């Protein structure tokens, strides 16, 4: 290139697809958000669905209470999907949908809307995440057992390969594995093992046309994570690409080099975003993006960045715009896209890549010896390993071995102007849920019930017979079937599943746990039994990492811990507390639904005569909501800033101690006949 060449004459690679993960409240509100983001330069859509939609419930179901429209948009039927993409031509759009257990259903709704718009299915471009195996390990929005879930994944792949050839039917998601604590080798090996399990399932289907296998392979994409150790992350991505090519040739005999290309999208790490000094998160996000864009041979095809304030709550449109501008500045203002891979020939990079590949091959062999990814998941083997890795990560931060600026080092600083004023987050009104309940009742009242009944019968027949689930799902979408009805009919056929919690291994403590152990031992002597902690995950929030680590550490400092995993109703949590004789209840809610869910738990405790049992709550909780919770009677609130687990254990022990002191004082007042003291019932037990 001539030194005199103008910038306009320089040949540049095409930039990656620029996305923002977005969706909240209603389809109409999310539609406004999408059209606004597209006008700002976004080049693809990434749809966030709320938890009822992701787990196959209608907005008026008991388990949907408090969750409607919180972490994404509520889509209960075809009318909602129609409104979501109003004035957005799907034939021209590249749409990514973060949906897994209900992926066949949401894709069916999308295809029905595309048909209404007159878009040919062959023209549609986009992705359904559809990686159900990782849901058992990290994200928690699974519904059915692994075998039928894998069958549904296969059905989507076979249908789209034939009918929607530009669609990516599955995103193998190592992203969520890193969020659950995975090391680079675990992220590589678990994701590749999942891909192998799915591809083997497709290949072994008796009705599958082997001649089209290379087409299936070429449409499997990945959704990865990138953390702060960005040199290692660059090497991880290069290792991913090389191992994928290796698997394509050696395991599946793919000869077409283009079909062996490792194609992936990315959202950089959210786990490392901090509540303390949240302005530092901007730098973290930008550094992490470099890991998936600098190396041309392993560059992301699509990028979506979290917002700086996601450790505080839901981002506002301005926050998402800021993250989008980071991508645009890197892609269009720098010369990054003018060069071939700038890391080729680096002996440091090559050595690290080879080491990662060797370790990953060894782990893949170990998983294969267990019986493959599905067997390893069902046995709890992979979940236990992730929980242990996450425990080591947390312990390293607690000890100061892993520095996190503003958290365990250089905590003192000036107040951030970014968090002044309105609290720096977006909040979803509680009226959204009531409005959604009204809308779905209206939808049910206006449809043809005979057509709905026939569509559900056809869906059930396909599920039981092994026929592809997509055609009857599309027909059901057009007939007016709801998300909850689709989910319930398949629950009746396949059953529901409870994944292993992984809370079985000895955790790694920071060495500062002795105070907690002594306090708990003293409490045990006073009680005449081991203090009992019930950890609950009310609602549909499947992000269990925090609850798992609390359960691990509490057990290790001496609590008798009960943790039954995700997706519990307030009634179930209170029943478990009564059964176990809990001395303290810990609730973990990361979906923003803490206020209504905790309110209901407290009400159920009062009904059960257990209002004396203290409740503590952990989650992404604003200062305003913390006050609301404490006014409800919550004893303590923990947020991401409370990263020292041993201090939380001391706090839990003191919560039990204060509750015992209060009960002793109340008992003494009752015996003394003090006016206003708690009364005894006929059995002699105190009534609170």
From Swiss-Prot:
It holds the Pfam family B12-binding. Its EC number is 5.4.99.63. The keyword Protein biosynthesis does not apply. Its cofactor is adenosylcob(III)alamin. It is an enzyme of class 5 (isomerase). Disruption phenotype: Cells lacking this gene lose the ability to grow on C1 (methanol and methylamine) and C2 (ethanol and ethylamine) compounds, and also on beta-hydroxybutyrate, but they grow normally on pyruvate. Growth on C1 and C2 compounds is restored by addition of glyoxylate or glycolate, indicating that these mutants are unable to convert acetyl-CoA into glyoxylate. Keywords: Cobalamin, Cobalt, Isomerase, Metal-binding. Residues 666-688 are annotated as: Disordered. NCBIfam families: acid_CoA_mut_C, acid_CoA_mut_N. Belongs to the methylmalonyl-CoA mutase family. This is Ethylmalonyl-CoA mutase. It comes from Methylorubrum extorquens (strain ATCC 14718 / DSM 1338 / JCM 2805 / NCIMB 9133 / AM1) (Methylobacterium extorquens). The lineage of its organism: Bacteria, Pseudomonadati, Pseudomonadota, Alphaproteobacteria, Hyphomicrobiales.
């Amino acid at each position: 290139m001539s030194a005199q060449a103008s910038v306009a004459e320089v040949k540049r690679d095409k930039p990656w697809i620029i996305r923002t993960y977005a969706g909240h409240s209603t389809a109409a509100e999310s539609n406004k958000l999408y059209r606004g983001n597209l006008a700002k330069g976004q080049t693809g859509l990434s749809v966030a669905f709320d938890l009822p939609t992701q787990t196959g419930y209608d907005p008026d179901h008991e388990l949907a209470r408090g969750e409607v429209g919180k972490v994404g948009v509520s889509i209960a039927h075809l009318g909602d999907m129609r409104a979501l993409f109003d004035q957005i031509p799907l034939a021209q759009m590249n749409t990514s949908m973060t949906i897994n257990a209900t992926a066949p259903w949401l894709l069916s709704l999308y295809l029905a809307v595309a048909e209404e718009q007159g878009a040919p299915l062959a023209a549609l471009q986009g992705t359904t995440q559809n990686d159900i195996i990782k849901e058992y390990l990290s994200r928690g929005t699974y519904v059915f057992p692994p075998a039928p879930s894998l069958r549904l994944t296969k059905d989507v792949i076979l249908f789209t390969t034939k009918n929607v050839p530009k669609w990516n039917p599955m995103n193998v998601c190592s992203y969520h594995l890193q969020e659950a604590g995975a090391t680079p080798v675990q992220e590589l090996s678990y994701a590749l093992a999942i891909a192998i399990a799915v591809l083997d399932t497709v290949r072994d289907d008796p009705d599958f046309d082997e001649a089209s296998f290379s087409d299936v392979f070429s449409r499997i994409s990945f959704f990865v994570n990138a953390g702060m150790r960005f040199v290692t992350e660059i090497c991880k991505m290069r290792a991913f690409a090389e191992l994928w090519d290796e698997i394509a040739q050696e395991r599946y005999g793919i000869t077409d080099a283009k079909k062996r290309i490792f194609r992936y999208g990315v959202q950089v790490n959210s786990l490392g975003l901090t509540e303390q000094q949240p302005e530092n998160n901007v730098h973290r996000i930008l550094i992490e993006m470099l890991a998936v864009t600098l190396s041309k041979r392993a560059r992301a095809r699509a990028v979506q960045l979290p917002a700086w304030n996601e450790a505080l709550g839901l981002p506002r449109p301005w926050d998402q715009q800021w993250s989008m501008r980071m991508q645009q500045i890197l892609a269009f203002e720098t010369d990054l896209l003018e060069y071939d891979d700038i890391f080729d020939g680096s002996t440091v990079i090559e050595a690290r890549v080879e080491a990662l590949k060797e370790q990953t091959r060894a782990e893949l062999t170990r998983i294969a010896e267990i019986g493959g990814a599905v067997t390893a998941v069902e046995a709890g083997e992979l979940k236990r390993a992730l929980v242990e890795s996450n425990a080591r990560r947390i312990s390293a931060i607690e000890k100061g071995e892993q520095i996190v600026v503003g958290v365990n080092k250089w905590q003192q600083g000036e107040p951030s102007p970014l968090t002044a004023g309105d609290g720096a987050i977006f909040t979803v009104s509680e009226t959204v849920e009531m409005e959604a309940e009204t809308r779905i009742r209206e939808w049910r009242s206006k449809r043809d019930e005979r057509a709905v009944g026939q569509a559900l019968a056809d869906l059930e027949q396909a599920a039981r017979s092994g026929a592809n689930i997509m055609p009857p799902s599309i027909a059901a979408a057009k007939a007016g079937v709801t998300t909850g009805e689709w989910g319930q009919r398949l629950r009746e056929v396949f059953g529901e599943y409870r994944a292993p919690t992984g809370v079985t291994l000895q955790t790694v403590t920071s060495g500062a746990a002795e105070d907690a152990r002594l306090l708990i031992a003293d409490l045990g002597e006073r009680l005449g039994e081991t203090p009992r902690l019930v950890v609950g995950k009310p609602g549909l929030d499947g992000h269990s990492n925090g609850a798992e680590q609390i359960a691990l550490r509490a057990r290790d400092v001496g609590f008798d811990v009960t943790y039954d995993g995700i997706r519990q109703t307030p009634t179930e949590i209170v029943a478990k507390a009564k059964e176990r004789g809990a001395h303290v209840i810990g609730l973990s809610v990361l979906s923003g639904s803490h206020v209504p869910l905790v309110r209901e738990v407290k009400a159920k405790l009062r009904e059960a005569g257990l209002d004396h049992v203290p409740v503590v709550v952990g989650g992404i909780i604003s200062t305003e909501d913390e006050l609301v919770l404490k006014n409800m009677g919550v004893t303590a609130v923990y947020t991401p800033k409370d990263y020292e687990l041993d201090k939380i254990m001391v706090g839990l022990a003191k919560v039990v101690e204060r509750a015992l002191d209060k009960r002793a004082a109340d008992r003494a007042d009752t015996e003394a006949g003090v006016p206003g003291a708690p009364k005894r019932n006929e059995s002699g037990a105190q009534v609170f």
